[in-house]
């Protein structure tokens, strides 16, 4: 029997409010994190992801009090990321109610952190978030893809998508799996906030190169987009924000639509 696919709302939090932008830019207010978290948990979300989107860029700690408040109103698995740089940071977040920690910039700066976290907290606790953007300045180090006009590679971006690393996302995904990541949260910056659908090419490429679960993120504008990414890739879960925050769709409706298309979710 195939494993059920997971539907995961995402709270991008900045200064204590949930926000949403397009391609990681031009963010606008989307509501209160605690209220939205409770709503999604009550509606039947499989998990919840909370990302403090400016913690790394501003070199500050994540908002632990907010994490604790959110954890107190939900009864589903809870992943928290943003500004986690050390074992102590991760421990604090887990003690404040998170079930998993997500690391992004810190894993690029210090890959051994992934291994250390896995050894202490277990693989099932560790999510490595990979933010990716197409880069058309390629060289021999990169796995290139032919575009209509020019070849490109999938580049890993850090600091909330604001800084390129020159790292090939395919090679990086394999590396974090080897280091002990339990799953990968894969966000396409090219698709983020556009509501034009998930980045099928990127998602498929990463899924085909790792064995750990991959969560697709960026671009969801309808339940049809979820159907498409589940049918065209081996992704285990989808992350969505805009369609839930602005009440375009409820989680019940999404799961019903997926069931009608033969996609099994956790009811």
Regions found by a protein language model. Name each.
Residues 12, 40, 48, 80, ...:
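Conserved, mostly hydrophobic/aromatic
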Residues 6-10, 47, 75-79, 100-102, ...:
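Structural preference for beta-strand elements that scaffold enzyme active sites
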Residues 29-41, 85-91, 165-175, 223-226:
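Short, acidic/polar
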Residues 47-66, 105, 185-196:
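Glycine-rich, proline-tolerant flexible connector loops at the mouths of alpha/beta enzymes
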Residues 13-15, 19, 98-186, 190-191:
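Conserved anion-binding
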Residues 58-81, 116-131, 195-222, 262-263:
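Alpha-helix-loop-beta-strand connector modules within alpha/beta enzyme cores
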Residues 113-121, 227-267:
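C-terminal helical cap(s) of enzyme catalytic domains, especially alpha/beta-barrels
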Residues 78-79, 84-101, 201-238:
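Catalytic cores of alpha/beta
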